[in-house]
């Protein structure tokens, strides 16, 4: 599992809304179904001087051409950058997903060029909202525009201000033996101000969508609200939840 690195206080600071063990961040989907109640999250509080992050070093590299990542996140300080996915190592090559200048950025850099570089036009500034993110990297896909995909609250993101897609069989340092970090962008020494919950990484698995909706980690209830759902597929060698 990931190791917890802290400067002063633990990041396990939220025991559900209101702080009670019976309070939940999310509830099962209305009307039944596979909805999963989530009762815990991790708080990363760079402003408090804690400089917390999670780290993991794989003993062997997994599939670097195909993987999926999913999580719920909540911004606690709009206007600040923070890392979402594992990695963002300190030197080239580097890669990961972050909130950068209030936009969601999916980027990986190697040598002197970007392997992938997607910046959403949508801005992320709401400190009260929980967002569900799914990121898919699949450079084996025959369609260039499908080799890197982002989904927000179940729906595929299609509006980008910057848009560079991976070449065939391109790789990033995500899922390599390089130390993987969540909550710390080493290249700029940026720590996070946010909450994370229900984090998944799938090694060698590119989850798919139906008409732009990905249902592997969530589902819409009868009111059209996106709710968490337990993933039931393969995790691969280096996958985790």
PLM region spans:
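Low-complexity, glycine/proline/serine-rich flexible segments
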Residues: 18-65, 102-103, 110-115, 176-179
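Beta-strand-rich interaction surfaces with strong enrichment in secreted/lumenal proteins
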Residues: 56-59, 119-124, 169-171
């Amino acid at each position: 599992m990931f190791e917890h690195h802290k400067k002063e206080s633990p990041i396990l600071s939220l025991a559900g809304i209101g702080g009670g063990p019976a309070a939940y961040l999310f509830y099962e989907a209305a009307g039944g179904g596979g909805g999963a109640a989530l009762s815990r999250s991790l708080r990363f509080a760079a402003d408090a001087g804690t400089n917390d992050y999670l780290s993991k070093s794989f003993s062997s590299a997994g599939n670097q051409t195909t993987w999926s990542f999913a999580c719920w996140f909540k911004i606690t300080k709009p206007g600040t950058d923070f890392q979402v996915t594992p990695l963002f190592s300190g030197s080239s090559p580097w890669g990961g997903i972050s909130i950068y200048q209030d936009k969601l950025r999916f980027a990986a850099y190697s040598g002197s060029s970007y392997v992938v570089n997607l910046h959403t036009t949508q801005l992320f500034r709401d400190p009260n909202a929980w967002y569900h993110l799914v990121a898919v990297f699949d450079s084996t896909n025959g369609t260039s525009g499908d080799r890197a995909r982002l989904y927000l609250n179940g729906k595929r993101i299609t509006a980008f201000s910057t848009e560079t897609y991976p070449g065939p069989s391109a790789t990033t340092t995500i899922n390599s033996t390089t130390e993987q970090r969540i909550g710390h962008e080493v290249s700029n020494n940026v720590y996070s101000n946010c909450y994370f919950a229900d984090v998944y990484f799938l090694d060698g698995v590119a989850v798919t969508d139906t008409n732009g909706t990905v249902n592997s980690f969530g589902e819409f209830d009868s009111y059209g609200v996106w709710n968490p759902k337990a993933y039931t597929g393969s995790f691969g060698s280096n996958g985790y939840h």
